[in-house]
């Protein structure tokens, strides 16, 4: 089964779910139907794993807009498979978890699962797309589906605000990403990602290289919640917990990181990229970790924790970006180890953070609150959830015998090794190492503190909104499976490292022998500096979490947050955009037409200037006599007159006369079909206009605005000049192959003796079909307007 068939299967399952929207009997089974999608996807990607491990890839290419190199092009290589397995397997756990979390009576289940599968479909599209424009389409689809999932409980104000904020920020980043892709196309002449990577040196030598880096980083940073674009992620926690566990910890927030991985071979050729990504990641890491200690809502704690961990991964991607400059030698081993660590920690983070979110969802579902100030002693009521969240928090903190310890130690190893890299010196190495250590200490602090406050101590049921909470086993099953993998990966890391992570690393550095530089993950590397840093984090972190009352000091600090800045700028944007809309949308049709024609004129003039004007060597003008001259003069005079006349009936009549003059031109040019069509349409249109006057209100005649009329005349003359110029340019050469021979065989190809009928009914049949649909829709609109009667009464309006 190809990738196209897989994505088509996901669409089919979504369509089936849509049919259950109106069937109450089947609505409660929506989750079980939705489970088919991640099961099919997981089986497919696991089936492809042995082949990809050997360096092969699956490729599907369907030509589309070949002139612009926009094709439906998919490629499943090691990196795509790594992310696809995360998306499908975590998706399987989340969809099953959602069947236990959501109410079958009160929640609109089919709608939720359609949104969730739409997001899964979009994410798989991002990671398998081999065309930049195709990737952008899926990129924005994730923003749309994320918006729909966050606002799923649309009656809540927090859901509405969080959805709008996340949509605004991520779509802004998506537009920046599109601009970056367009610049890449300008430089390389291709949208194929594999071809772009092959031309990395050409891009690096271009004067657009730095703008390309900035635009792609904007796309990645907004999607992966990097400072200062992180503010949307905590507000997105208003979504149902399955959404938070899937989108905002394991998948969507990793899309930006995937983008950085995919274009490392190109972007890593710039030291600007390495510095920018590394320091933005480290700032995000420490910012998220410190802010997590200030929260009381468990999902808010995990949201800032996710921001911090994403920053950690991004910083490793930045540090490892130098592999593009040094693909061989001793330096390549350091870069390769750091990139490997980034992939390793990304996988670990998806597991322990998904388990943590699911645990929080169980507690919220059963107790009615996520406020750690109201929770205590829950290990007696939720023993399985206690173990799951405890081990997951310890793994996140980098405690031995859990997978997080291995990737955290590799992170420290990468930080201290930067002193050997040409982009860094001893001072920078010390700075980034200190930032990493401090952020890691706070990671342990908020993780252990949350477990202590929620699960340890005396159980106080009276403070809980819901009474008699319990822990259904099937509810805990997905998070328990994720938790079991945490120590398993610690003891057999190379099973995952060699079979899943190494193929992904090969795809990041296409054409390089990364097997020689990829590290062998070991639980013991001796007593070295990374181990010492890990021990410092553990000791200091536990002391702060269990012995020091740091919480009161953390919440005494009052700072003007970036959220306040966002809200202020959002209000200003809303104010000025409202002013702009009111200026443009003034309910004057001629104003809209004027603006449209002006923009069209500028685009056409710019295109003609860029293309250059050919040498004029021939001008073909049709033969004309007195009738043509008189008709042309009539059209010209009536056109000028229409600019100044204000009587509606007179304007309609004069407009009809112009239409009849066009009919005369068609007759003189021996086009009877066109003349007949023009005559009928002009007559019907004129009659409809006159009849409609009886239903229109009496509007006082407006005074003639000389400036406005002058603009109309100038725009009209400008369009006339442009059209005539285009006709003359078209006469100067055959830049495009002629289509006359194509129409010469019209009778044989279509059976139509009339060339116009052959064009409309066969050669451009689809275009004609859609034109007919437009007419039908317009007719329905007119029918509705003519038959609309104002409904009276409050009950009818409701």
UniProtKB/Swiss-Prot annotation:
Residue spans crossing the bilayer: 1-21, 33-53, 78-98, 109-129, 133-153, 167-187, 209-229, 241-261, 272-292, 300-320, 337-357, 381-401, 431-451, 472-492, 526-546, 593-613, 625-645, 649-669, 674-694, 710-730, 766-786
Membrane topology designation: Multi-pass membrane protein
Coiled-coil segments on the chain, per record: none
Keyword annotations of the record: Antiport, Cell membrane, Ion transport, Membrane, Transmembrane, Transmembrane helix, Transport
GO terms (BP aspect): monoatomic ion transport
One term under GO cellular component: plasma membrane
Pfam families: MbhD, MbhE, Proton_antipo_M, Proton_antipo_N
Subcellular location: Cell membrane
Location (main, coarse): membrane
GO MF terms held by the record: antiporter activity
Family: Belongs to the CPA3 antiporters (TC 2.A.63) subunit A family.
Subunit structure: May form a heterooligomeric complex that consists of seven subunits: mnhA2, mnhB2, mnhC2, mnhD2, mnhE2, mnhF2 and mnhG2.
Name the UniProt record assigns to this protein: Putative antiporter subunit mnhA2
Species name: Staphylococcus saprophyticus subsp. saprophyticus (strain ATCC 15305 / DSM 20229 / NCIMB 8711 / NCTC 7292 / S-41)
């Amino acid at each position: 089964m190809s990738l196209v068939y897989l994505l088509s299967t996901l669409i089919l399952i979504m369509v089936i779910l849509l049919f259950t929207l109106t069937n109450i009997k089947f609505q409660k089974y929506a989750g079980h139907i939705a489970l088919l999608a991640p099961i099919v996807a997981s089986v497919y990607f696991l089936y492809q794993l042995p082949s990809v491990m050997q360096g092969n890839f699956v490729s599907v290419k369907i030509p589309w807009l070949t002139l612009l190199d926009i094709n439906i092009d998919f490629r499943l290589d090691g990196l795509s498979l790594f992310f696809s397995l995360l998306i499908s397997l975590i998706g399987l756990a989340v969809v099953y978890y959602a069947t236990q979390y959501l109410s079958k009576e009160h929640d609109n289940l089919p709608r939720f699962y359609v949104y969730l599968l739409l997001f899964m479909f979009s994410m798989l599209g991002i990671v398998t797309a081999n065309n930049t424009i195709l990737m952008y389409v899926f990129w924005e689809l994730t923003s749309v589906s994320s918006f729909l999932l966050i606002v799923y409980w649309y009656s809540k104000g927090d859901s509405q605000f969080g959805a709008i904020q996340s949509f605004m920020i991520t779509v802004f980043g998506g537009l920046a990403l599109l601009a970056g892709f367009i610049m890449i196309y300008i430089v390389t002449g291709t949208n194929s990602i594999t071809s772009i990577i092959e031309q990395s040196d050409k891009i690096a030598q271009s004067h657009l290289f730095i703008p390309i880096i900035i635009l792609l980083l904007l796309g990645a940073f907004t999607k992966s919640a990097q400072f200062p674009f992180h503010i949307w992620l905590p507000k997105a926690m208003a979504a149902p917990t399955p959404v938070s566990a899937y989108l905002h910890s394991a998948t969507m927030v990793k899309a930006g990181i995937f983008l950085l991985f995919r274009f490392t071979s190109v972007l890593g050729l710039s030291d600007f990229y390495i510095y920018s990504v590394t320091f933005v990641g480290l700032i995000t890491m420490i910012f998220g970790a410190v802010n997590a200690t200030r929260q009381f809502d468990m999902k808010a704690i995990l949201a800032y924790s996710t921001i911090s961990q994403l920053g950690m991964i991004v910083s490793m991607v930045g540090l490892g970006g130098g592999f593009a400059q040094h693909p061989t030698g001793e330096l390549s081993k350091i870069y390769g180890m750091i990139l490997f660590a980034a992939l390793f920690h990304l996988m670990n983070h998806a597991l322990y953070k998904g388990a943590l979110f699911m645990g929080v969802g169980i507690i919220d579902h059963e107790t009615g609150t996520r406020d750690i100030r109201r929770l205590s002693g829950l290990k007696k009521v939720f023993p399985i959830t206690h173990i799951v969240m405890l081990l997951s928090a310890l793994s996140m903190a980098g405690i031995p015998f859990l997978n997080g310890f291995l990737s955290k130690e590799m992170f420290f190893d990468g930080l201290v090794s930067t002193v050997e890299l040409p982009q860094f010196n001893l001072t920078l190495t010390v700075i980034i190492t200190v930032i990493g250590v401090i952020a890691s200490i706070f990671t342990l602090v908020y993780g252990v503190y949350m477990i202590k406050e929620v699960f340890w101590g005396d159980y106080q049921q009276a403070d809980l909104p819901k009474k008699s909470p319990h822990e259904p086993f099937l509810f805990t099953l997905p998070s328990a499976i994720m938790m079991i993998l945490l120590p398993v990966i610690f003891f057999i890391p190379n099973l995952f490292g060699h079979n899943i992570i190494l193929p992904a690393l090969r795809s990041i550095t296409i054409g390089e022998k990364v097997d020689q530089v990829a590290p062998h993950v070991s639980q013991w590397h001796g007593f070295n500096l990374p181990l010492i840093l890990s021990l410092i984090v553990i000791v200091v972190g536990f002391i702060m979490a269990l012995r020091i009352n740091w919480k009161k000091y953390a919440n005494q600090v009052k700072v003007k947050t970036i959220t306040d800045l966002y809200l202020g700028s959002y209000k200003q944007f809303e104010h000025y955009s409202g002013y702009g809309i009111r200026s443009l949308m003034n309910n004057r049709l001629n104003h809209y037409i004027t603006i449209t024609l002006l923009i069209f004129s500028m685009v056409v003039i710019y295109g003609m200037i860029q293309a250059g004007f050919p040498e004029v060597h021939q001008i073909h003008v049709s033969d004309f006599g007195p009738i043509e001259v008189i008709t042309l003069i009539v059209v010209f005079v009536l056109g000028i007159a229409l600019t100044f006349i204000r009587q509606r009936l007179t304007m309609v009549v004069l407009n009809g006369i112009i239409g009849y003059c066009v009919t005369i031109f068609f007759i003189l040019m021996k086009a009877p079909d066109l003349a007949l069509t023009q005559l009928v349409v002009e007559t019907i249109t004129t009659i409809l206009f006159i009849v409609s006057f009886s239903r229109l209100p009496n509007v006082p005649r407006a005074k003639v605005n000389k400036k406005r009329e002058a603009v109309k005349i100038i725009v009209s003359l400008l369009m006339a000049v442009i059209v005539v110029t285009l006709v003359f340019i078209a006469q100067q050469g055959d830049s495009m192959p002629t289509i006359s021979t194509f129409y010469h065989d019209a009778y044989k190809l279509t059976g139509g003796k009339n060339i116009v009928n052959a064009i409309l009914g066969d050669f451009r049949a689809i275009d004609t079909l859609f034109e007919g649909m437009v007419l039908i829709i317009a007719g329905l609109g007119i029918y509705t307007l003519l038959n609309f009667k104002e409904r009276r009464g409050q009950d009818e309006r409701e």
